[in-house]
């Protein structure tokens, strides 16, 4: 077991079940307890927004868990700027819902890892695709699937300017463990569908019917595979 200092964050909030599952993963991988800096409420879809014109409040839950009024990217900035400056890796998630293809540009989960990369810290964004009509998400199973993947990715040499994006599929409770597929992000844009009601426009696109390129992360995860994609910033 390594002695890496792992920083954990998410966009679903400090009390989210997915973040608790990610703590399980971190505790299996490193002998050092992880540091958690996460939003005090849900910031899903926050993208890479950061706070520079107003104050951020930080609530210390204990000596290694902090909740903040900031966005996911703010959480990483706060950590590296004072709460946990000696971080080795940034892990974000496990997001409730997929962050596949074009989602990486809107996801607060992915933005947190991207912010770490900008400051020279390697990272892994982790998400769990959610499909209607299937058994509830099993976060203990998600942690079990994710642990060997994160351990493997952390053991590899890091190329500055890159990060890993991992998506878990939503399969039935009785299904066999999914295969792991290394693949590219799907470049297809999300659907441009809106419904007009009383002068207001409501997004009406169906995430589960989104366009997809065969063999891409969207295609593979929707078919039941764990997808691992290397994302390059520069």
Task: Give the label of every model feature segment.
Residues 2-6, 20-86:
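A cross-family phosphate/adenosyl-ligand binding-site feature
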Residues 79-84, 111-122:
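Alpha-helix C-terminal capping segments
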Residues 137-234:
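Electrostatically charged, flexible surface regions
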